[in-house]
């Protein structure tokens, strides 16, 4: 009987010990802060001119810090200045042509056309009377048929000349046709667009920094003939600075966008940077080879982007970091 009691007591003690260990392990796993490993990810941008030309000068070198709007380099702007002057002249010519069409014809021009109509009328009257005389003479066999035909041809030509002069006078009196004015307006709009493009091209002979950063590479030197979009500088942007890390599915619930984390580097293990989770990938992927955590290397993980809110110059592209989540 005593032996049975001892066995039962031993079983109860073993069960209680197992439960206690399980509870302790559960609390330990849930109370421990999540630690991830990642790398600093700083964006870089390739800067170049939008237009082609000969590189005239560069104002910065590798390692220089730049600020938004700073002049980094210039192209030879001579060809673009000439193009701008030509475009300005074309606009002035188109404006003058449109103004001339809208103003219509001057009184002096109209008077000149009236005089032309009167001259053509007199010429027609003479030719018509001459034809009538020739017709009378032809009836009496005094002129040949050939002479009569010549008189008729001269009369017809005089009539055509008179009609052309009358049409010209009517146009001068009524002004230019709406279609001609519309065409001149379209021509002016085209030359103005060409002028705007010439101005933009001239502006783009100056390379400006789009944002703050540090010059990583200076790819060309003054005197180089560049095509549009050739890389002149490669710049690392100082803002934003991110950390790329990966979390397993088991801990995905702790990686909530907006959550605050601490980021440690080997150079300052006791003074963390602060960051916020800005992005969590919606799709899983196999762990990249760069992940430092051995137990994640065969897992499917989710990529995180952590934005460093107090970044400084000590953070460099690719630097390994440790990301710690606050204890729950």
Swiss-Prot record:
> Where's it mainly located?
periplasm
Pfam families recorded? HlyD_D23 (PF16576)
Query: Which protein family is it in?
Result: Belongs to the UPF0194 family.
- HAMAP family, A to Z: UPF0194 (MF_01304)
The record's Gene Ontology cellular component field reads: periplasmic space
Q: Where is the signal peptide?
A: 1-22
Q: Where in the cell is it found?
A: Periplasm
Its protein name is UPF0194 membrane protein YPTS_1292
List the source organism.
Answer: Yersinia pseudotuberculosis serotype IB (strain PB1/+)
Q: Which residues form a coiled coil?
A: 80-109, 142-209
Alphabetized InterPro entries for the sequence? CusB_D23, UPF0194_membrane_YbhG, UPF0194_transport
The UniProt entry, under PANTHER family, shows:
EFFLUX SYSTEM COMPONENT YKNX-RELATED, UPF0194 MEMBRANE PROTEIN YBHG
Q: Which UniProt keywords apply?
A: Coiled coil, Periplasm, Signal
